[in-house]
A protein has these predicted regions:
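Catalytic cores of secreted/periplasmic lytic hydrolases that degrade extracellular macromolecules
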Residues: 1-206, 210-341
Length: 341
């Protein structure tokens, strides 16, 4: 819809930061010497694809494609949204399916079938902060894990394709779609492999908790907005207390899952987070586990409070032991979910 396109463009109105990645990444290269193909030439070609010198800026011509698969809210959705369950019903659902955070911490698995489309209104009335936080994490955790699993699957497919000398038309079409999705020109493999990566679960949970007050904010309740992303032209919620002339709003989403996907796509494409992606790529290159407490240092531009925002996120991660969830994967309950592992 027109509203969705306006929302899409609004995410990229922040000033661009012309910071380049200056570290090469070492990947194992598999080159098959075919008849008539010069081995050295083929090796050099693959080296150029895999070992770039910098991540390029987002292609402005492709900005509209970045959020094309995300279900933003529009007035057409009024009255057609999925059911909002109350807190008691959600808690009973989790109990019936034996879904609790203690078990998740132990097994490192979460059932993504426990997906909730909207936060319960009653979460604001839960007096116990411990109980409120637990319910919030139970609701948001499966959404983050599932979206990360999809990115991980795409990343695996990307490297499988790059390891081949000759690609099928289906593979070429897949690559073309991913270049669009990540705001890049066709053939920019280096930038694609840097951008196509996961966001640590602990970091995403901490940001969602901070931006929504553990699910109690008006933006989260009315617009399924877990990460406070702004829009200047699209459908959104106007923050209270802002100047009348202020044009920005907080973007609304049809369901919570759409907010998670938009957040990940934003961190993976916006020029403000190029240093975040650089550090993440370095951790990958060194075969390290993604460290949210290091990566969070590169999110000072996510909020106007800068370093203070970073300090708050670190505190949330540590106090709530959120890094326990960084290794959590999708529980294989069906053939569909098995493919995400």
């Amino acid at each position: 819809s027109v509203i969705s396109l306006l929302v899409i463009f609004s995410f990229f109105t922040l000033p661009s930061i012309n910071i380049f990645l200056d570290k090469n990444f070492n990947f194992k290269k598999s080159v098959i010497s075919n008849a008539g193909v010069n081995f050295d030439q083929e090796l050099e070609k693959r080296k150029k694809i895999l070992d770039g010198e910098k991540e390029t800026k987002t292609n402005k011509l492709n900005l509209k494609n970045i959020f094309a698969d995300i279900d933003f809210f529009s007035t057409d959705d009024e009255g057609q949204n999925s059911i909002r369950f109350d807190a008691r019903t959600i808690e009973q659902l989790f109990k019936d399916t034996n879904y609790n955070l203690e078990k998740v911490r132990e097994t490192k698995l979460v059932n993504i079938g426990n997906k909730i489309d909207h936060l319960p209104k009653e979460i604001k009335s839960i007096e116990s902060s411990k109980k409120r936080k637990r319910l919030f994490i139970q609701i948001v955790l499966p959404l983050i894990v599932e979206e990360n699993a999809k990115i991980r699957l795409d990343r695996k497919e990307l490297f499988r394709i790059l390891a081949k000398n000759i690609n099928t038309q289906k593979e070429k079409n897949w690559l073309k779609e991913k270049f669009k999705q990540y705001g890049l020109r066709d053939g920019d493999f280096y930038s694609l492999k840097v951008r196509m990566d996961e966001i640590p679960v602990s970091l995403a949970l901490a940001q969602a908790a901070k931006e929504t007050g553990w699910g109690t904010s008006r933006f989260a309740q009315e617009g399924n907005a877990l990460f406070g992303q702004w829009t200047w032209n699209g459908e959104g919620i106007r923050p209270a207390g802002v100047d009348k002339d202020a044009k920005h709003k907080v973007a609304k989403f049809a369901v919570l899952k759409a907010s998670v996907r938009a957040y990940q796509r934003n961190l993976n494409t916006h020029s403000s987070y190029i240093e975040f992606r650089k550090e993440r790529a370095i951790q990958r290159d060194n075969d390290e586990k993604l460290d949210s407490l290091k990566l969070v240092n590169y999110l000072d531009k996510y909020a106007e409070t800068g370093q203070q925002y970073i300090d708050v996120l670190k505190q949330i991660i540590k106090q709530n032991s959120l890094t326990d969830f960084d290794d959590v994967n999708v529980m294989p309950t069906s053939n569909k979910t098995k493919k995400l592992i």
